[in-house]
Regions:
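Membrane-interface "cap" regions at the ends of multi-pass membrane proteins
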Residues: 1-77, 81-89, 195
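Select transmembrane alpha-helical segments in multipass membrane proteins
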Residues: 23-33, 59-60, 99-112, 144-148, ...
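Hydrophobic alpha-helical membrane-associated segments
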Residues: 35-38, 42, 67-71, 117, ...
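Hydrophobic alpha-helical transmembrane segments in multi-pass membrane proteins
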Residues: 36, 40-44, 61, 65, ...
Length: 251
């Protein structure tokens, strides 16, 4: 009887008896979220957005997109701290707040979206890597993407522990790439070029088209929710890791 009374007195978000996970905030939420946010859109399409919208409108796009991600993160934190979060990711949270019908419908869409995003990211990886080989082969990006998918399948087959270790390698490469970007911008600073690129291009497809191209870059913060079943304390790790990932990506 005392055991049940103690369980009922625990805060909803702090119950870890059913979590059964081993990952903490950094490995389980922050790392997968930040790796998805700073993904292929940032490296392959941000230049296109800046070149067409200009730096001024690009900053507005960043402000609007990140405002949406911050508000969504607040909602996610409110749900995670008021429920006993278990495995199931987005489906679990939505089904417990809006009902199983909404949870099932949205869960299927999220599953398909994440499946397609794997191919999308691998194709982007192949597109970026193909020019390094100087091979006159039109399907080389697709070949590289297929090899990347096979490589990721092996890690998924081995389990979450191997995938968690590998994501640290990816993060190290990502941090190096971003640092080189900032170092290059400081060393090659050109005020005249900044003024020239501030306004939008006459051939720009429009603000909302460019916003739609860039917006998927800020949606990766929900990736940590998918790891809810592997977290030691989902009620604490999900809001902390999500806010940390969104904050770092904004900076």
């Amino acid at each position: 009887m005392k055991h049940h009374e103690m369980e009922n007195n625990l805060p909803a978000g702090s119950d870890t008896s059913d979590a059964g996970g081993t990952l903490g905030t950094f490995a389980g939420v922050f790392t997968p979220s930040i790796l998805t946010i700073l993904g292929i859109i940032l490296f392959l399409r941000l230049g296109y957005v800046v070149g067409n919208a200009g730096l001024g409108l690009t900053l507005l796009i960043l402000l609007l997109a990140n405002s949406i991600s911050v508000l969504t993160s607040v909602s996610l934190a409110a749900i995670a701290t008021n429920l006993k979060v278990k495995g199931g990711g987005d489906y679990y949270l939505i089904s417990r707040t809006l009902g199983h019908e909404f949870g099932g419908a949205i869960g299927i869409v999220v599953f398909l979206a994440q499946s397609v995003s794997i191919a999308f990211y691998c194709l982007g990886f192949g597109e970026a890597l193909a020019p390094l080989f100087n091979a006159h082969l039109s399907i080389l990006p697709q070949i590289i993407a297929a090899l990347a998918v096979s490589f990721l399948f092996i890690f998924a087959w081995l389990g979450a522990d191997w995938a968690t270790r590998f994501q640290y390698v990816v993060m190290a490469v990502l941090v190096t790439a971003i640092m080189s970007y900032f170092i290059g911008g400081i060393l090659k600073w050109d005020s005249a070029l900044l003024v020239q690129n501030w306004s939008s291009s006459p051939t720009s497809p429009g603000f909302w088209v460019l916003f739609a191209i860039f917006f998927p870059a800020v949606t990766g913060f929900t990736q940590g929710v998918s790891m809810s079943g592997d977290l030691q304390d989902p009620g604490r790790s999900l809001p902390r890791g999500t806010f940390l990932a969104v904050g770092v990506s904004i900076i």
